[in-house]
Amino acid sequence: MHKTGIARLTLIIGVIFIVTFIITDYCLSEMFKDYIYQPGTLKPVDSVPKLKAGDQSPDFTLPAVSGEKISLNQYLGKKNVVISFVPAAWTPVCSDQWPGYNLVKNIFDKYDAILLGITVDNIPTLYAWTFPMGKLWFPVLSDFWPHGAVAERYGVLRSNGVSERALFVIDKKGIILYIDVHDINKRPRLEDLVKELEKLK
C-alpha cells in the first residue's frame, strides 16, 4: 500500500509538472504575442561550423543586463556551463525558449551547471525584452559590439548578422561536450538538454 501511494504521488507530481509547463508556455506566448516581430520561416541553419565536441571553448567577456561583466573563464574549475545563443529579442521562438529554462533550474543545480544566454542585441533592448519574462535565473549577455564577435568565434553567426539558435554544453575544464545548432525556426527540446546535463560529472 505504501509503495502504491508513493507511485501515485510520483505520477501526480509528474502530471502537475507537465501541466505547469504547458500553461506557463501558453501564458508567456500570450503575454508577448502583441509585441513580437514575425520574421516568417527562415533558412534553418546559415553559418559555418568552427568548433566540435572535444574542442576547448573560446573565452569571452560580455556585458550582462544586470550591469556586470561575465567571462566564460570565471567558471573554469567551478561550474559546468551551457551557452544558449538565440537569434534576436522580440521574436516568437526566442521569447518562449528562455523562460522555459526557469522550469529546469533544479536540474542545472543538480549537475553544478550555469546557463549563459547570449544574443546580438544591445543591453537596452535585452532589458526591455526580458523584463516582462519575470526573474530569469541566468545571466543574459549582449554580443552587440563588436557585433556578433562571440557568435562568430563559436561559428554560429548567420549571414544576416544574428546568431543561430544554438546550445553548447561545456565542462568545468572548458571542454565542449555537446553542440546543437538547431533549426532557427524551432525551439530546442528541454528534454534533450536535460539528457546532456545528466551526462555531466
Where are these regions (language model features)?
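Structural microenvironment flanking redox-active thiols in thiol-disulfide oxidoreductases
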Residues: 95-136, 146-150
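Short loop/turn microsegments at loop-to-beta-strand junctions
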Residues: 57-58, 80-82, 164-166
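Structural micro-motif
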Residues: 137-138, 156-168
